[in-house]
């Protein structure tokens, strides 16, 4: 998988290989793991339950304030077995029926802020159903954006997975597959992305898809509305036309 496109690896097949070879199966679910809670989650994503450990960034698709990262481990004893140590300057009483959690025994980091509070508050406020509804809305908006891009004559839809859509400004006459035209499209879209960042009309990032420079929309904000995504294709097309015209004036674009 890759965060660039939201692609998901064949987790069930990987889990079988790990079990057969007694390997630890870790999944980087920093962005996409929360979508496993959706009723129509992809089968590969549902296989997340087979992992020995999963990394999640709640500041991404659980809408927590930056920054908040965590790891979920199937066998909690594996962490202190790996990281715990007792230097002479530590004197904690770890006995009793309910010993305190000493986080230095659970990972490399010792001193740390109370990141868990904001995640806990979000879970208490929204609950499972609330998060499912918000994530479903994000995926619905991404589908709407992908449909509009696919129907737009000047844009090329490259990928759509979960709430991530990658595409590029690509007028048909430049979609030849020739190296020089691909280079022209890359240059147009790289410049277009900088214009978007400077103008503030929409915030997109970038990815590489089959070697092509792509614009990347990742919807992970519960405040995003349909009107926001409906505006993106024409904003991109308008800026692309201006950039293409500048290229033509300079003799860059092919006829």
Predicted regions and their residues:
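Active-site core of PLP-dependent enzymes with the aminotransferase class I/II
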Residues: 1-21
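Active-site C-terminal subdomain of aminotransferase-like
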Residues: 2, 21, 26, 46-152
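Active-site-proximal loop/turn and secondary-structure-junction residues that shape catalytic pockets
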Residues: 2, 31-33, 60, 221
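Short acidic, glycine/serine/threonine-rich loops at helix termini
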Residues: 6-10, 35-40, 65-68, 83-84
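Secondary-structure transition/capping motifs at alpha-helix termini
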Residues: 15-26, 78-80, 152-155, 239-248, ...
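Short beta-strand
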Residues: 156-161, 204-208
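Conserved PLP-binding catalytic core of the aspartate aminotransferase-like
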Residues: 157-196
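PLP-dependent enzyme catalytic core of the Aspartate aminotransferase-like
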Residues: 178, 206-255
